[in-house]
């Protein structure tokens, strides 16, 4: 997509360091399936032989109800970076997350700590951490967000 076609996905005039909940989706570059092992590579293994939900990382919401496929090393890097967000940003918590084949979903919550990093900085750091470990730029430019404004949005 050329610069002239690029759409900015943030709400204009909204302060993304405002306390609250945010639903974030970050896609891989070219929407390539970097995060789950290939179905073809696992056809010789019975489903019961695979680790539970393939996660290997104690991360709330990291499950694949339809496939139970293990994460690739890039998927593990993403899951670990998600898990570590509260270590780097004490005012942020990950309520739920899931690593999909070519994207991740996060339900991030920011508490009321003045002067702390907002969603853009947190997502930028997480993306940079995964790309550095992978050795290449794994993510597409930007990300999608939805500001959770009430209980209806949260469910």
Language-model segments: which ranges?
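Short catalytic/metal-binding and nucleic-acid-binding patches
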Residues: 1-155
């Amino acid at each position: 997509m050329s610069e002239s076609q690029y759409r900015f996905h943030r709400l204009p005039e909204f302060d993304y360091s405002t306390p609250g909940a945010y639903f974030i989706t970050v896609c891989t570059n070219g929407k390539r399936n970097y995060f789950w092992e290939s179905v073809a590579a696992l056809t010789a293994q019975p489903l019961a032989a695979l680790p539970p939900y393939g996660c290997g990382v104690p991360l709330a919401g990291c499950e694949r109800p339809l496939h139970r496929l293990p994460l690739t090393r890039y998927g593990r890097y993403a899951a670990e970076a998600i898990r570590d967000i509260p270590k780097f940003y004490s005012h942020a918590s990950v309520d739920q997350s899931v690593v999909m084949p070519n994207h991740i979903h996060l339900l991030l919550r920011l508490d009321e700590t003045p002067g702390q990093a907002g969603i853009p900085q947190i997502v930028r750091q997480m993306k940079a951490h995964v790309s550095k470990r992978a050795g290449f730029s794994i993510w597409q430019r930007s990300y999608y967000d939805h500001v959770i404004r009430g209980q209806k949005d949260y469910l």
